[in-house]
Amino acid sequence: MSSEEEDQTAIVCDNGSGLVKAGFAGDDAPRAVFPSIVGRPRHQGVMVGMGQKDSYVGDEAQSKRGILTLKYPIEHGIITNWDDMEKIWHHTFYNELRIAPEEHPTLLTEAPLNPKANREKMTQIMFETFNVPAMYVAIQAVLSLYASGRTTGIVLDSGDGISHNVPIYEGYALPHAIARMDLAGRDLTEYLTKILTERGYSFVTTAEKEIVRDIKEKLCYVALDFEQEMATAASSTSLEKSYELPDGQVITIGNERFRCPETLFQPSFIGMESAGIHETTYNSIMKCDIDIRKDLYANNVLSGGTTMYPGIADRMQKEITALAPSTMKIKIIAPPERKYSVWIGGSILSSLSTFNQMWITKAEYDEAGPSIVHRKCF
Protein backbone atom coordinates (compact mmCIF):
# COMPACT_ATOMS: atom_id res chain seq x y z
CA MET A 1 0.00 0.00 0.00
CA SER A 2 1.24 3.48 -0.82
CA SER A 3 1.95 5.95 1.96
CA GLU A 4 -1.13 8.08 1.37
CA GLU A 5 -3.32 5.01 1.71
CA GLU A 6 -1.85 4.07 5.04
CA ASP A 7 -3.30 6.97 7.00
CA GLN A 8 -6.73 5.83 5.83
CA THR A 9 -7.97 3.70 8.68
CA ALA A 10 -9.50 0.43 7.59
CA ILE A 11 -13.22 -0.15 8.10
CA VAL A 12 -14.34 -3.39 9.73
CA CYS A 13 -17.88 -4.45 8.93
CA ASP A 14 -19.30 -7.63 10.43
CA ASN A 15 -22.57 -8.26 8.63
CA GLY A 16 -24.57 -10.60 10.79
CA SER A 17 -27.98 -12.07 10.01
CA GLY A 18 -29.38 -10.05 12.92
CA LEU A 19 -27.04 -7.13 13.58
CA VAL A 20 -24.49 -5.16 11.59
CA LYS A 21 -21.39 -4.35 13.65
CA ALA A 22 -19.22 -1.71 12.00
CA GLY A 23 -16.35 0.53 12.99
CA PHE A 24 -12.70 1.42 12.54
CA ALA A 25 -9.71 -0.91 12.70
CA GLY A 26 -7.77 -0.49 15.93
CA ASP A 27 -10.84 0.47 17.99
CA ASP A 28 -11.76 -1.87 20.82
CA ALA A 29 -15.49 -1.92 20.05
CA PRO A 30 -17.68 -1.27 17.00
CA ARG A 31 -18.91 2.35 16.59
CA ALA A 32 -22.17 1.31 14.99
CA VAL A 33 -24.34 -1.65 15.93
CA PHE A 34 -27.75 -1.74 14.32
CA PRO A 35 -30.26 -4.37 13.17
CA SER A 36 -29.76 -5.79 9.64
CA ILE A 37 -33.28 -4.79 8.68
CA VAL A 38 -34.78 -3.00 5.74
CA GLY A 39 -38.35 -1.82 6.33
CA ARG A 40 -40.89 -0.72 3.75
CA PRO A 41 -44.19 1.06 4.47
CA ARG A 42 -47.16 -1.30 4.73
CA HIS A 43 -49.63 1.36 3.65
CA GLN A 44 -49.78 4.17 1.15
CA GLY A 45 -48.72 7.52 2.62
CA VAL A 46 -51.72 9.80 3.26
CA MET A 47 -49.90 12.81 4.69
CA VAL A 48 -48.61 14.69 1.68
CA GLY A 49 -45.22 16.30 2.21
CA MET A 50 -44.30 14.10 5.18
CA GLY A 51 -41.22 13.18 3.19
CA GLN A 52 -41.92 9.49 3.53
CA LYS A 53 -39.11 7.33 2.23
CA ASP A 54 -39.72 4.13 0.34
CA SER A 55 -37.38 2.26 2.67
CA TYR A 56 -35.83 2.57 6.11
CA VAL A 57 -32.71 0.82 7.39
CA GLY A 58 -31.60 -0.35 10.84
CA ASP A 59 -32.69 1.56 13.93
CA GLU A 60 -34.94 3.87 11.97
CA ALA A 61 -36.81 0.86 10.58
CA GLN A 62 -36.93 -0.55 14.12
CA SER A 63 -38.46 2.63 15.57
CA LYS A 64 -41.10 2.89 12.84
CA ARG A 65 -41.74 -0.87 12.83
CA GLY A 66 -45.45 -0.44 13.56
CA ILE A 67 -46.10 0.90 10.06
CA LEU A 68 -43.46 -1.10 8.19
CA THR A 69 -42.92 -4.61 6.91
CA LEU A 70 -39.46 -5.65 8.10
CA LYS A 71 -37.15 -7.85 6.06
CA TYR A 72 -33.76 -9.30 6.93
CA PRO A 73 -31.59 -9.48 3.78
CA ILE A 74 -29.23 -12.01 5.39
CA GLU A 75 -30.74 -15.40 6.17
CA HIS A 76 -28.70 -18.14 7.81
CA GLY A 77 -25.54 -16.13 7.19
CA ILE A 78 -26.12 -15.98 3.44
CA ILE A 79 -27.11 -12.76 1.69
CA THR A 80 -30.41 -13.47 -0.05
CA ASN A 81 -31.39 -9.97 -1.10
CA TRP A 82 -28.57 -7.99 -2.68
CA ASP A 83 -30.52 -4.76 -3.27
CA ASP A 84 -31.41 -4.55 0.41
CA MET A 85 -27.87 -5.52 1.36
CA GLU A 86 -26.54 -2.64 -0.71
CA LYS A 87 -28.90 -0.32 1.20
CA ILE A 88 -27.50 -1.63 4.47
CA TRP A 89 -23.89 -1.09 3.39
CA HIS A 90 -24.76 2.38 2.09
CA HIS A 91 -26.37 3.18 5.44
CA THR A 92 -23.31 1.79 7.27
CA PHE A 93 -20.77 3.91 5.38
CA TYR A 94 -22.63 7.18 4.91
CA ASN A 95 -25.06 7.44 7.85
CA GLU A 96 -23.49 5.42 10.67
CA LEU A 97 -19.72 5.77 10.17
CA ARG A 98 -20.01 8.95 8.05
CA ILE A 99 -17.09 8.12 5.82
CA ALA A 100 -16.49 7.86 2.08
CA PRO A 101 -15.90 4.17 1.30
CA GLU A 102 -13.60 5.03 -1.63
CA GLU A 103 -11.06 6.29 0.92
CA HIS A 104 -10.93 3.27 3.24
CA PRO A 105 -9.87 -0.36 2.86
CA THR A 106 -12.79 -2.51 4.06
CA LEU A 107 -12.74 -5.83 5.90
CA LEU A 108 -15.96 -7.84 5.60
CA THR A 109 -16.84 -11.09 7.35
CA GLU A 110 -18.71 -14.20 6.29
CA ALA A 111 -19.87 -17.52 7.66
CA PRO A 112 -17.71 -20.59 6.99
CA LEU A 113 -18.83 -22.89 4.16
CA ASN A 114 -20.72 -20.08 2.47
CA PRO A 115 -21.43 -20.45 -1.26
CA LYS A 116 -18.56 -19.10 -3.35
CA ALA A 117 -20.88 -16.88 -5.36
CA ASN A 118 -21.76 -15.05 -2.16
CA ARG A 119 -18.25 -13.74 -1.51
CA GLU A 120 -17.68 -12.96 -5.20
CA LYS A 121 -20.77 -10.79 -5.29
CA MET A 122 -19.69 -9.10 -2.04
CA THR A 123 -16.31 -8.32 -3.61
CA GLN A 124 -17.92 -7.03 -6.79
CA ILE A 125 -20.30 -4.67 -4.94
CA MET A 126 -17.50 -3.30 -2.76
CA PHE A 127 -15.27 -2.46 -5.72
CA GLU A 128 -17.88 -1.48 -8.31
CA THR A 129 -20.64 0.18 -6.27
CA PHE A 130 -18.65 1.61 -3.37
CA ASN A 131 -15.26 1.93 -5.12
CA VAL A 132 -13.27 0.82 -2.07
CA PRO A 133 -9.46 1.01 -2.55
CA ALA A 134 -8.97 -2.46 -1.04
CA MET A 135 -11.00 -5.15 0.69
CA TYR A 136 -10.78 -8.54 2.38
CA VAL A 137 -13.29 -11.21 3.40
CA ALA A 138 -12.53 -13.06 6.65
CA ILE A 139 -14.20 -16.08 8.25
CA GLN A 140 -16.17 -15.01 11.33
CA ALA A 141 -15.15 -17.78 13.73
CA VAL A 142 -11.44 -17.31 12.99
CA LEU A 143 -11.75 -13.64 13.97
CA SER A 144 -13.42 -14.61 17.27
CA LEU A 145 -10.45 -16.81 18.09
CA TYR A 146 -8.01 -13.93 17.37
CA ALA A 147 -10.08 -11.74 19.68
CA SER A 148 -9.63 -14.24 22.51
CA GLY A 149 -5.85 -14.05 21.99
CA ARG A 150 -5.46 -17.60 20.68
CA THR A 151 -4.41 -19.19 17.43
CA THR A 152 -5.59 -22.72 18.29
CA GLY A 153 -9.00 -23.73 19.58
CA ILE A 154 -12.53 -24.68 18.57
CA VAL A 155 -15.00 -21.84 18.22
CA LEU A 156 -18.73 -22.22 18.68
CA ASP A 157 -20.03 -19.15 16.92
CA SER A 158 -23.77 -18.74 17.19
CA GLY A 159 -25.52 -15.62 15.99
CA ASP A 160 -29.00 -14.82 14.81
CA GLY A 161 -29.04 -16.81 11.59
CA ILE A 162 -26.47 -19.55 11.88
CA SER A 163 -24.29 -21.49 14.32
CA HIS A 164 -21.07 -23.26 13.55
CA ASN A 165 -18.22 -25.13 15.14
CA VAL A 166 -14.89 -24.26 13.64
CA PRO A 167 -11.71 -26.01 14.80
CA ILE A 168 -8.67 -23.84 14.18
CA TYR A 169 -5.06 -24.93 14.46
CA GLU A 170 -2.25 -22.36 14.43
CA GLY A 171 -4.53 -19.83 12.74
CA TYR A 172 -5.89 -22.12 10.01
CA ALA A 173 -9.50 -23.29 10.02
CA LEU A 174 -9.78 -27.05 9.36
CA PRO A 175 -12.54 -27.11 6.72
CA HIS A 176 -13.21 -30.86 6.81
CA ALA A 177 -14.19 -30.64 10.48
CA ILE A 178 -16.41 -27.54 10.35
CA ALA A 179 -19.97 -28.19 11.44
CA ARG A 180 -22.67 -25.79 10.36
CA MET A 181 -26.16 -25.68 11.88
CA ASP A 182 -29.01 -23.58 10.62
CA LEU A 183 -30.24 -23.22 14.19
CA ALA A 184 -29.59 -19.91 15.90
CA GLY A 185 -31.10 -16.87 17.57
CA ARG A 186 -33.86 -16.27 15.06
CA ASP A 187 -35.11 -19.84 15.43
CA LEU A 188 -35.10 -19.44 19.20
CA THR A 189 -37.14 -16.25 18.86
CA GLU A 190 -39.62 -18.15 16.66
CA TYR A 191 -39.79 -20.97 19.19
CA LEU A 192 -40.34 -18.57 22.09
CA THR A 193 -43.14 -16.94 20.08
CA LYS A 194 -44.71 -20.37 19.69
CA ILE A 195 -44.51 -21.39 23.35
CA LEU A 196 -45.79 -17.99 24.48
CA THR A 197 -48.85 -18.65 22.31
CA GLU A 198 -49.55 -21.65 24.55
CA ARG A 199 -49.84 -19.18 27.42
CA GLY A 200 -52.32 -17.15 25.42
CA TYR A 201 -49.96 -14.37 24.35
CA SER A 202 -49.95 -13.95 20.61
CA PHE A 203 -47.27 -12.12 18.62
CA VAL A 204 -48.03 -12.03 14.92
CA THR A 205 -46.51 -9.18 12.94
CA THR A 206 -42.83 -8.73 12.14
CA ALA A 207 -42.83 -5.85 14.64
CA GLU A 208 -44.23 -8.03 17.45
CA LYS A 209 -41.55 -10.65 16.75
CA GLU A 210 -39.03 -7.98 17.73
CA ILE A 211 -40.71 -7.73 21.14
CA VAL A 212 -40.29 -11.49 21.59
CA ARG A 213 -36.61 -11.13 20.73
CA ASP A 214 -36.29 -8.56 23.48
CA ILE A 215 -38.03 -10.87 25.99
CA LYS A 216 -35.63 -13.63 24.95
CA GLU A 217 -32.56 -11.44 25.40
CA LYS A 218 -33.65 -10.11 28.78
CA LEU A 219 -35.16 -13.16 30.49
CA CYS A 220 -33.95 -16.44 29.00
CA TYR A 221 -31.20 -18.62 30.47
CA VAL A 222 -29.78 -22.12 30.04
CA ALA A 223 -30.60 -24.69 32.73
CA LEU A 224 -27.74 -26.85 34.02
CA ASP A 225 -30.14 -29.77 34.40
CA PHE A 226 -33.23 -29.36 32.23
CA GLU A 227 -35.43 -32.03 33.86
CA GLN A 228 -34.69 -30.73 37.34
CA GLU A 229 -35.38 -27.15 36.28
CA MET A 230 -38.74 -28.22 34.78
CA ALA A 231 -39.64 -29.84 38.12
CA THR A 232 -38.68 -26.68 40.03
CA ALA A 233 -40.75 -24.55 37.66
CA ALA A 234 -43.76 -26.83 38.09
CA SER A 235 -43.66 -26.85 41.89
CA SER A 236 -42.95 -23.19 42.65
CA THR A 237 -43.15 -19.71 41.17
CA SER A 238 -39.52 -18.89 42.00
CA LEU A 239 -38.49 -18.96 38.33
CA GLU A 240 -41.26 -16.67 37.09
CA LYS A 241 -40.43 -13.23 35.77
CA SER A 242 -42.64 -10.50 34.40
CA TYR A 243 -42.14 -8.35 31.32
CA GLU A 244 -43.91 -5.14 30.41
CA LEU A 245 -45.09 -4.86 26.81
CA PRO A 246 -44.92 -1.48 24.99
CA ASP A 247 -48.66 -0.93 25.63
CA GLY A 248 -48.24 -1.35 29.40
CA GLN A 249 -49.67 -4.88 29.60
CA VAL A 250 -47.54 -7.11 31.84
CA ILE A 251 -46.94 -10.75 30.93
CA THR A 252 -45.45 -13.45 33.13
CA ILE A 253 -43.14 -16.15 31.85
CA GLY A 254 -41.88 -19.19 33.75
CA ASN A 255 -40.39 -22.35 32.28
CA GLU A 256 -40.31 -20.68 28.83
CA ARG A 257 -37.24 -18.83 30.12
CA PHE A 258 -35.09 -21.95 29.87
CA ARG A 259 -37.21 -24.05 27.49
CA CYS A 260 -36.39 -21.61 24.70
CA PRO A 261 -32.55 -21.86 24.71
CA GLU A 262 -32.72 -25.58 25.61
CA THR A 263 -33.40 -25.98 21.88
CA LEU A 264 -29.67 -25.42 21.30
CA PHE A 265 -28.99 -28.65 23.17
CA GLN A 266 -32.14 -30.45 21.98
CA PRO A 267 -32.99 -29.27 18.44
CA SER A 268 -35.83 -31.82 18.34
CA PHE A 269 -37.83 -29.19 20.27
CA ILE A 270 -38.34 -27.35 16.99
CA GLY A 271 -38.50 -30.48 14.87
CA MET A 272 -34.88 -30.43 13.73
CA GLU A 273 -33.00 -33.69 13.40
CA SER A 274 -29.65 -32.06 14.05
CA ALA A 275 -27.45 -32.88 17.05
CA GLY A 276 -27.26 -30.32 19.89
CA ILE A 277 -24.42 -27.78 20.07
CA HIS A 278 -22.53 -29.92 22.60
CA GLU A 279 -22.59 -32.92 20.26
CA THR A 280 -21.66 -30.93 17.16
CA THR A 281 -18.70 -29.52 19.11
CA TYR A 282 -17.61 -33.00 20.16
CA ASN A 283 -18.10 -34.43 16.64
CA SER A 284 -16.12 -31.58 15.18
CA ILE A 285 -13.21 -32.25 17.56
CA MET A 286 -13.35 -35.97 16.71
CA LYS A 287 -12.97 -35.17 13.00
CA CYS A 288 -9.62 -33.52 13.74
CA ASP A 289 -6.25 -35.20 13.98
CA ILE A 290 -5.82 -37.14 17.22
CA ASP A 291 -2.72 -35.10 18.14
CA ILE A 292 -4.51 -31.76 18.25
CA ARG A 293 -7.72 -32.81 20.04
CA LYS A 294 -6.26 -32.10 23.45
CA ASP A 295 -5.59 -28.48 22.47
CA LEU A 296 -9.12 -28.12 21.11
CA TYR A 297 -10.78 -29.53 24.25
CA ALA A 298 -8.80 -27.06 26.36
CA ASN A 299 -9.78 -24.09 24.15
CA ASN A 300 -13.53 -24.12 23.53
CA VAL A 301 -14.30 -20.51 22.65
CA LEU A 302 -17.89 -19.25 22.61
CA SER A 303 -18.77 -16.32 20.36
CA GLY A 304 -21.84 -14.54 19.02
CA GLY A 305 -25.04 -13.22 20.57
CA THR A 306 -26.74 -16.60 20.95
CA THR A 307 -23.99 -17.70 23.35
CA MET A 308 -24.89 -14.82 25.71
CA TYR A 309 -27.43 -16.80 27.76
CA PRO A 310 -26.52 -17.05 31.44
CA GLY A 311 -25.56 -20.64 32.28
CA ILE A 312 -24.54 -21.68 28.77
CA ALA A 313 -20.82 -22.10 29.58
CA ASP A 314 -21.46 -24.31 32.63
CA ARG A 315 -23.89 -26.43 30.64
CA MET A 316 -21.39 -26.85 27.77
CA GLN A 317 -18.70 -27.82 30.28
CA LYS A 318 -21.00 -30.45 31.78
CA GLU A 319 -22.16 -31.87 28.42
CA ILE A 320 -18.73 -32.04 26.79
CA THR A 321 -17.16 -33.55 29.91
CA ALA A 322 -19.77 -36.31 29.66
CA LEU A 323 -18.81 -37.04 26.03
CA ALA A 324 -15.02 -36.67 26.21
CA PRO A 325 -12.45 -39.13 27.60
CA SER A 326 -12.55 -38.97 31.41
CA THR A 327 -9.00 -37.66 31.90
CA MET A 328 -9.33 -34.88 29.33
CA LYS A 329 -8.99 -31.28 30.54
CA ILE A 330 -11.91 -29.31 29.19
CA LYS A 331 -12.14 -25.55 29.25
CA ILE A 332 -14.95 -23.36 27.96
CA ILE A 333 -13.89 -19.78 27.29
CA ALA A 334 -16.79 -17.33 27.33
CA PRO A 335 -15.36 -13.79 27.07
CA PRO A 336 -17.80 -11.12 28.33
CA GLU A 337 -17.52 -9.20 25.06
CA ARG A 338 -18.29 -12.27 22.93
CA LYS A 339 -21.30 -10.58 21.35
CA TYR A 340 -18.80 -8.51 19.39
CA SER A 341 -15.77 -10.79 19.32
CA VAL A 342 -15.96 -11.32 15.55
CA TRP A 343 -15.77 -7.56 15.05
CA ILE A 344 -12.98 -7.18 17.63
CA GLY A 345 -10.99 -9.92 15.89
CA GLY A 346 -11.45 -8.07 12.59
CA SER A 347 -10.24 -4.86 14.20
CA ILE A 348 -7.13 -6.65 15.51
CA LEU A 349 -6.41 -8.40 12.21
CA SER A 350 -6.79 -5.37 9.96
CA SER A 351 -4.58 -3.19 12.16
CA LEU A 352 -1.63 -5.63 12.05
CA SER A 353 1.23 -4.32 9.92
CA THR A 354 1.65 -7.78 8.37
CA PHE A 355 -1.93 -7.64 7.11
CA ASN A 356 -1.09 -4.91 4.60
CA GLN A 357 -0.08 -7.36 1.89
CA MET A 358 -3.24 -9.42 2.43
CA TRP A 359 -5.70 -6.83 1.11
CA ILE A 360 -7.21 -7.33 -2.35
CA THR A 361 -6.48 -4.02 -4.05
CA LYS A 362 -8.59 -2.28 -6.67
CA ALA A 363 -5.83 -2.95 -9.23
CA GLU A 364 -5.84 -6.68 -8.51
CA TYR A 365 -9.61 -6.75 -8.77
CA ASP A 366 -9.60 -4.90 -12.09
CA GLU A 367 -7.11 -7.41 -13.43
CA ALA A 368 -8.62 -10.67 -12.18
CA GLY A 369 -12.28 -9.96 -11.47
CA PRO A 370 -14.41 -11.16 -8.52
CA SER A 371 -12.81 -14.64 -8.41
CA ILE A 372 -9.66 -13.04 -6.94
CA VAL A 373 -11.39 -13.37 -3.57
CA HIS A 374 -10.89 -17.16 -3.50
CA ARG A 375 -7.17 -16.79 -4.12
CA LYS A 376 -6.50 -14.12 -1.54
CA CYS A 377 -8.99 -14.86 1.23
CA PHE A 378 -9.23 -18.32 2.69
UniProtKB/Swiss-Prot annotation:
Molecular function (GO) terms for this protein are: ATP binding; hydrolase activity
UniProt KW Nucleotide-binding keyword? yes
Q: What SMART domains does the record point to?
A: ACTIN (SM00268)
A single GO CC term for this protein reads: cytoplasm
Q: Which InterPro entries match?
A: Actin (IPR004000), Actin/actin-like_CS (IPR020902), Actin_CS (IPR004001), ATPase_NBD (IPR043129)
Q: Which reaction(s) does its UniProt entry say it catalyses?
A: ATP + H2O = ADP + phosphate + H(+)
- Compartment(s) of residence: Cytoplasm, Cytoskeleton
Q: Name one Pfam family in it.
A: Actin
Q: Which family does it belong to?
A: Belongs to the actin family.
Q: What does this protein do?
A: Actins are highly conserved proteins that are involved in various types of cell motility and are ubiquitously expressed in all eukaryotic cells. Multiple isoforms are involved in various cellular functions such as cytoskeleton structure, cell mobility, chromosome movement and muscle contraction.
UniProt cross-references to PANTHER family, sorted A to Z: ACTIN
Name listed for the protein in its UniProt record: Actin, larval muscle-type
